């Protein structure tokens, strides 16, 4: 592999309040493993590690042979590193943002807009919606990872309406009846009824929400103290969210949204307009390069209930359908590929057996090119390189090719490394 170039990156850490504290955070551990000078404060949260070129977290290049630049600046000056297809498709920019998240307390009830809505929201309120790009994203668990994702089957929601009168009261009798009747109707009737119920909940008066939530918390707490299980109404989760966000309407969202607990390596893909919330655990997250989020609960940040209720996809599905399983590479037994139906990124997980060191960057680049999409097509890939001690994130973007003018850029997380191969790429089996 000719003319390879390797240089380290300093990647941005976001210390949002919901992050895990100090060295309990995988984000903090990755930061410390890559920077011997990093000082980890045990009383501060380390929520997200950003690897990419987004303006809010553009990685910095650490190389004495290169004048001080961010990764975004360097790519702007060296666009051929993306490969011609990615360069042309995404206007010479890195199309994805890769993160590691360490979640201690719940993130907001949220969704991300499609491209058309993102442009509209950015034009109307750039202070709240800083990007004009869509934000499809994938979360892959590093540890046991809990989250809410997509609307539950209507049958489950109707069951909660029966068992949780406080929930039923906020929805209202008319909307609840409409939802029950939709169970024997067509898909459009279900979508309409679900939209009506969810909108009624999210637009409930604050005073009524607090009253009903306090009643529900008291009832669950009494039953738990008496030794009774409240699992059938997600009692433990309700108490947990209420403790984190007292009186918040988002606590009731658990009765609308699927609850998923991902095992390490399991993933969920969140396309545009899918409601979701991360609750607890560590994950890697890859997304289109955007920071647009429409929120409506479980957050002290700006909420936009009208936009969220209008934009959401109200198609219900069982929780198992929200899982996004990887496919095994046919050419390499160590690779698993998470390939969502968007052009912005693909995630590849490499599990290295034996030893505890990472495989070489050059060999990983070879594997990336060998397992990328068909010749001539753009690809944007994220690799998770597993060893005995830690999973190391490693990013690639480029073009699957047989031409000498194509290229591969790789951005490493755990090792903060960029590999650049500007002249040629290996062929399968090389």
Predicted features by range, described:
Residues 40, 377, 412-430:
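Intrinsically disordered, low-complexity basic segments at termini and long loops, enriched
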Residues 59-65, 71-94, 150-153, 244-263, ...:
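A short beta-strand-loop-beta hairpin characteristic of the jelly-roll/cupin
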Residues 186-307:
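Contiguous mid-protein beta-loop-alpha structural module that forms a pocket-lining wall or clamp
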